[in-house]
């Protein structure tokens, strides 16, 4: 029984990995059909549906992975780091690095892979970015409490600026067919971003 569950879980993971790889390839700029995905995995479409009731559920699983990966690591940064600037830098670098290491998933983060899918999926990505922006806003607000001095610019504006930078770099990565990596020249870019945090 345990072997059957493990085999089923492994097949589910194989399907999700194939979908992520297809999103990373030139297929990712077009609608991915279950027929193409089944061919990529080497199974029938019916076999896909034994593991996932719909393609939407496959995307849901990938979005869950993205959410868990980013939010868990952001929470670790907040737990381990106390300096506001360091926290912000590490969160931004985390988002950019995650996108760079997972090009197919970056197509989901930017919405490119979801254009042909249910609107609900884009809504989940929007919620994820709202959560990240709320985390950034909280870090910015805590500066006054932690360091005795806050920012002169509204924290809402600063948080949205940081997130817009991340989204822009991820979009550039996708638009360039993954040529321009989001973390390229990050050490030179960060002082420009940090200078806006006043």
From Swiss-Prot:
DNA-binding span(s): 33-52
Subcellular localization: Cytoplasm, Nucleoid
A GO cellular component entry from the record: cytoplasm
Coiled-coil annotated spans: 117-144
Keywords, in A-Z order: Cell cycle, Cell division, Coiled coil, Cytoplasm, DNA-binding
InterPro entries cross-referenced by the UniProt entry: DNA-bd_HTH_TetR-type_CS, Homeodomain-like_sf, HTH-type_TetR-like_transc_reg, HTH_TetR, NO_SlmA, SlmA-like_C, Tet_transcr_reg_TetR-rel_C_sf
UniProt cross-references to PROSITE patterns, sorted A to Z: HTH_TETR_1, HTH_TETR_2
Subunit note: Homodimer. Interacts with FtsZ.
HAMAP family named in the record: NO_factor_SlmA
Protein name: Nucleoid occlusion factor SlmA
């Amino acid at each position: 029984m345990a072997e059957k569950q493990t085999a089923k879980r492994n097949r589910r993971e194989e399907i999700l990995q194939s979908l992520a790889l297809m999103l990373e390839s030139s297929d990712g700029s077009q609608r991915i059909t279950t027929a193409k995905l089944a061919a990529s995995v080497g199974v029938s479409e019916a076999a896909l549906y034994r593991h996932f009731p719909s393609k939407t559920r496959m995307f849901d699983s990938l979005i869950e992975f993205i959410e868990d990966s980013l939010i868990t690591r952001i929470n670790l940064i907040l737990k381990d780091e106390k300096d506001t600037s360091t926290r912000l830098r590490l969160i931004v670098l985390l988002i950019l690095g995650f996108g760079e290491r997972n090009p197919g998933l970056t197509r989901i983060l930017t919405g490119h892979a979801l254009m042909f899918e249910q609107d609900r999926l884009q809504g989940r990505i929007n919620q994820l970015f709202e959560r990240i922006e709320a985390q950034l806003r909280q870090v910015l607000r805590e500066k006054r409490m932690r360091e005795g001095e806050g920012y002169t610019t509204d924290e809402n504006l600063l948080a949205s600026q940081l997130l817009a930078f991340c989204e822009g770099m991820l979009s550039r990565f996708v638009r360039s067919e993954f040529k321009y990596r989001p973390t390229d020249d990050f050490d030179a870019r960060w002082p420009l971003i940090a200078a806006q945090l006043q």
